[in-house]
Structures are given as C-alpha cells and as structure tokens.
Design a protein with these regions (language model features):
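Non-heme di-metal
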Residues: 1-220
C-alpha cells in the first residue's frame, strides 16, 4: 500500500508554492533567442520599434503565458506529491523544473515589455494545485492522462499565440516557440508512460476552465 505524503513533503510543497508565487524564478536554460536569420532582423526591429498597441498586446499575451506557467507549477507539484510510482513522481518533478524555465522566461519578457504578471496568480496556483491533487488521487494512469491532455491543449494555445503576437516581436515569439516544444515533449512522455485518455466531458471542462483563466489573466 502506498504511503501518503510526509510532513516534510507538505513543507516542501508550501516552499515551492511561495517560490513560484513570490520569488524571482531562476531558469536553468537561457532565455530563447531568435534564430540566426531572425536575429539579424531583430537588430533592426527592437522593442522600441513596436507600436504602443503592439507592446500592450505582447505584454497581455505573455502575462497569460506566465499565469499558465504558474498553474503548471501547481499542477506538477501536486501530481508529484501524490504520485504512487517513483518514476511518475520524478517525471512530474522534472517537468516542473522545465516549467520553471518557462516561468522565468515569461517574467523576464514581461519586465522587458514594461508590464507585470497577473495579480490573480495566487488564485491560479491554488486552484491548479487542487485540480492536480484530484488527478493524482485517481491514480497514476489518470494523472498521466491529465498531463497529456493538458499539454495537448497548451500546445494549441501557444500555437494560437504565435498567430496573435506581433510579427516584429521576435523575442516573445522565440520564447513561445521554445515553450511549445517542451510542452509537446511532456505530453508525449505522459502518453507513452501509460496515460489514459480522459472522458470527453472532462476534456471539455478543462478547456472551459483554461478559457476563464486566459481571458482573465489577459486583463488582470
């Protein structure tokens, strides 16, 4: 019979939550930069060349992405905390570490654009931690299936942002593309590790929940 989380695990979870919400995130990987051809163009088109409207749009979209990464931290931490299998737990923790890079990249970009993260990040974290806990309690296959479906939806969301970001904002576009690549990898790993396909109503509920967060974080 699997043992429940220890007191140290709960303390560690609280520490991770405080770090995700209030401490500057530290990335293990550098902020993605445009490719060689795009980089040459980027030297001609700096942030100062973006119109005020383009800057506001980029900032709003990157704020949404930052909020999504806060939620991802909570989901992965909760699912790792209640995972039955050690390999599943390690996968969740490794994915959370990669999502920390995303969090740091988005925060850096928001600062460059003169903007800020969502003021509702504590709400996104708390809600996502609860959702991740429920998914993990249903068993590792359900938890992995939840990751696979979440990342599939996130990939679609990031692809839509590549269509919405101003063409001249090459820096934001490079960050979003690198994030998308990682999310695809997480989803594929979860699926190959035995993740079950979630029922249609659950997938739709996930879409609607993400839509609420996206629309709210865009503004606040």
């Amino acid at each position: 019979m699997a043992r429940g989380p220890s007191l140290d695990t709960f303390i560690s979870a609280a520490d991770r939550a405080l770090r995700a919400l209030f401490a500057p995130p530290t990335a293990a990987r550098p902020v993605p930069a445009p490719g060689p051809a795009a980089a040459r163009e980027a030297q001609k088109t700096s942030d100062s060349a973006l119109t005020p409207e383009e800057k506001r749009e980029s900032a709003a979209l990157m704020r949404v992405n930052h909020a999504g990464e806060v939620a991802a931290q909570a989901l992965y931490h909760a699912q790792a905390m209640f995972a039955r299998d050690g390999e599943v737990r390690e996968f969740m923790l490794q994915a959370a570490r990669e999502e920390t890079d995303h969090l740091a990249w988005c925060e850096t970009r928001l600062e460059e654009l003169g903007s800020r993260p969502s003021v509702l990040n504590p709400l996104w974290y708390a809600g996502s931690f609860g959702i991740g806990t429920v998914a993990a309690m249903l068993g590792d296959r359900a938890s992995l299936g939840f990751v696979a479906e979440t990342e599939r939806q996130v990939e679609g969301h990031l692809k839509s942002h590549l269509d919405l970001l101003p063409d001249a904002d090459l820096r934001s576009r490079a960050i979003v593309e690198a994030m998308r690549h990682d999310e695809v990898g997480h989803g594929q790993h979860a699926q190959s590790a035995g993740g079950m396909r979630l029922p249609g109503p659950i997938r739709e509920l996930m879409r609607q929940t993400a839509r609420v967060m996206t629309h709210t974080a865009y503004r606040f």
